[in-house]
């Protein structure tokens, strides 16, 4: 049976995105981050709303309005569609395990 916390022995050089469920209006994925960040000159500007929970590790997010958020295991947030944001830090030990839900969550 799949386990959200189970990690393979390989070391990830890139963030790993694993689709768990995908439907007509929703996508649920697990993301494994091992120190990766968003390019400082780039922003995510997603078409869909995103609800995300950090299940393990620590991370820092930044928004286009200069808001900064520090996340620890168990913290979650809702990022509305077209809200510019980026990941500025993800812990390596422990690795970050995220659960993200993408969809039209406000409509």
Language-model-derived ranges and their functions:
Residues 36-37, 73-74, 80-82:
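Tight coil/turn sites that cap or link beta-strands
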Residues 19, 28-30, 51, 68, ...:
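Conserved hydrophobic/aromatic beta-strand scaffold that supports enzyme active sites
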Residues 1-43:
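A short, N-terminal "cap"/entry segment at the start of jelly-roll beta-barrel domains
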Residues 37, 60, 107:
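Flexible, glycine-rich phosphate/dinucleotide-binding loops
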Residues 82-107:
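Ligand-binding loop in jelly-roll beta-barrel domains
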Residues 16-18, 58, 84:
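Short, acidic/polar N-cap/turn motifs at the starts of alpha helices
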Residues 25, 66, 92-94:
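Short strand-connecting beta-turns/loops that link adjacent beta-strands
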Residues 45-46, 51-73, 88:
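A short beta-strand-loop-beta hairpin characteristic of the jelly-roll/cupin
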């Amino acid at each position: 049976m799949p386990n959200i916390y189970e990690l393979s022995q390989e070391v990830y050089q890139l963030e790993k995105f694993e689709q768990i469920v995908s439907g007509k209006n929703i996508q649920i994925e697990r993301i494994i981050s091992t120190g990766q960040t968003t390019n400082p000159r780039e922003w995510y500007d997603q078409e869909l709303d995103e609800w995300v929970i950090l299940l393990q590790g620590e991370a820092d997010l930044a928004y286009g309005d200069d808001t900064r958020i520090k996340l620890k295991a168990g913290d979650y947030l809702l990022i509305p569609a077209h809200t510019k944001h980026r990941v500025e830090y993800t812990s390596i030990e422990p690795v970050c395990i995220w659960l993200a839900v993408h969809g039209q969550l406000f409509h």
